[in-house]
């Protein structure tokens, strides 16, 4: 007897002007790859397929893609059937987004939860930092706050539950972990994740009119350590416009600032 496909897509109506295609019930790179594969296919179809002509925003999440359309210009039922068929064809090849190498400072009040996490895991603080620096994180989705990246790839031994009592104020650009996820708070806000460091890089910048959010689903992120002095120097350069975000793209021919 054939086993059921646990990643088989489901089609869900989100009001009368949006469809959601959902894959499985777990968060994994394979599931997210199907989501991103479907998003790429729909983005191409918007250019030359009349059925997709009124499609607007595409919203990928951990395990689903929501597609907004104009119900006055589109046969919603036909669009839904086509989406479901495309979802069934979506492969699990990982979406290759951009690769970033971003600075982070782990010193002092930038990392208030680092000592507690290290103690809970029976590791030295240096060992926790080493594991974070050795990992490559994958952006699954942007959510919670504008530009807030939910990233998989956290080493399992560093998994940590959210704080029992969330902080009323988390500083902008704080590197944080919760459960098996890693994230960066692009804005000052309340939050319950464990704060392990801070980056001088602005992950959301309204001056970047075309794409204010720096990271996107499918991107990869690696971290490199900087001192407090280096952090402040980089922050000044970034805020002054001397160090554009593209400087942190990882490429064979490009050396990131240090």
Segment roles from a protein language model:
Residues 2-258:
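Glycine-rich active-site loops that engage anionic ligands at enzyme catalytic sites
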């Amino acid at each position: 007897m054939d086993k059921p496909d646990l990643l088989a897509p489901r089609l869900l109506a989100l009001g009368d002007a949006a469809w959601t295609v959902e894959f499985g019930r777990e968060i994994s790179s394979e599931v997210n790859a199907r989501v991103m594969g479907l998003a790429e296919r729909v983005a191409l179809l918007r250019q030359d397929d009349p059925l997709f002509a009124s499609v607007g925003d595409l919203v990928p999440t951990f395990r689903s893609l929501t597609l907004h359309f104009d119900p006055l210009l589109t046969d919603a039922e036909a669009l839904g059937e086509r989406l479901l068929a495309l979802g069934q064809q979506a492969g699990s090849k990982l979406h290759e987004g951009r690769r970033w190498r971003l600075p982070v400072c782990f010193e002092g009040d930038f990392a208030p939860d680092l000592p507690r996490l290290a103690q809970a895991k029976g590791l030295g603080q240096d060992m926790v930092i080493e594991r974070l620096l050795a990992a490559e994180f994958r952006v699954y989705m942007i959510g919670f706050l504008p530009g807030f990246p939910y990233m998989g790839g956290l080493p399992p031994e560093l998994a940590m539950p959210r704080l029992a009592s969330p902080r009323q104020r988390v500083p902008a650009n704080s590197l944080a972990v919760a459960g098996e996820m890693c994230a960066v708070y692009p804005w000052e806000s309340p939050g319950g994740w464990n704060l392990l460091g801070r980056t001088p890089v602005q992950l959301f910048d309204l001056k970047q009119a075309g794409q204010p959010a720096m990271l996107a689903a499918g991107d990869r992120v690696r971290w490199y350590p900087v001192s407090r002095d280096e952090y402040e120097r980089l922050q000044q350069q970034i805020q002054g416009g001397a160090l554009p975000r593209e400087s942190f793209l990882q490429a064979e021919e490009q050396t990131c600032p240090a």
